[in-house]
């Protein structure tokens, strides 16, 4: 295993490619992640802020979010397969993605999940607003959180529904973060002791895990965002 970029009592950050690092990891109770969406690849026309990482943030000079669609599907299936192998028998993956319009049809995130991995539920993240310059389809204002779960996985609540109305956050360090409150809800409604985010970005998953008293591992390809996440996670948990 590589030396951590940053580590404290709750959080460990690794700088590198998740496909290379995942085989060294195990005993993960929950994966919470949001990969690049490939919005510039093969004619995708999805509106909204999106995840055009190279255009919106200089932390990803080698990734323009424009892979050929078949290559992108193969990559994401490989990542999800590697994540599945890190889980405990009661573990689960919360995989944040979105429907994308490519050509004349919508591409659903379900195609990115290997056939042997059971998608138990689709949680709708209602962002409240969106943006679209294309009149061939309506303004997209929601994303998906796929719950991909081992048979023994259970939530710790019976009161949380499958539509999460959480406004997206603007003006952060990363071009496409999900809100801290979304990460807090996902982690807080499980009893997972160890959380993993293989596309860590600015460290939202890790910050939420630390605030909830859980341990977390983050993997990030960009050294710039490793540093941003490390500074964010180095802050002590505030007493409420």
Language-model features: where?
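Core catalytic lobe of class I
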Residues: 2-227
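Short, conserved SAM-binding/catalytic segment
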Residues: 4-8, 230-240
């Amino acid at each position: 295993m590589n030396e951590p970029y940053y580590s404290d009592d709750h959080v460990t950050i690794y700088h590198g490619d998740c496909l290379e690092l995942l085989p060294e990891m195990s005993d993960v109770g929950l994966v919470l992640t949001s990969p690049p969406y490939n919005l510039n690849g093969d004619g995708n026309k999805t509106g909204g802020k999106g995840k055009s990482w190279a255009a919106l943030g200089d932390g990803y000079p080698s990734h323009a979010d424009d892979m050929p669609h078949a290559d992108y599907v193969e990559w994401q299936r490989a990542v999800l397969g590697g994540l599945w192998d890190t889980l405990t028998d009661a573990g689960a993956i919360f995989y944040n993605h979105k429907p994308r319009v490519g050509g004349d049809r919508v591409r659903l995130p379900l195609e990115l999940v290997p056939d042997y991995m059971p998608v138990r539920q689709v949680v709708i993240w209602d962002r409240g607003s969106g943006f679209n310059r294309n009149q061939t389809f309506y303004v997209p204002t929601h994303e998906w959180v796929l719950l991909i779960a081992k048979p023994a996985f259970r939530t710790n609540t019976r009161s949380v529904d499958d539509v999460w109305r959480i406004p997206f956050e603007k003006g952060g360090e990363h071009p496409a973060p999900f809100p801290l409150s979304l990460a807090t809800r996902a982690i807080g409604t499980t009893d997972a002791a160890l959380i993993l985010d293989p596309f860590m970005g600015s460290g939202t998953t890790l910050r939420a895990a630390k605030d909830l008293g859980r341990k977390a591992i983050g993997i990030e390809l960009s050294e710039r965002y490793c540093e941003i996440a490390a500074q964010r996670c180095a802050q002590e948990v505030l007493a409420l």
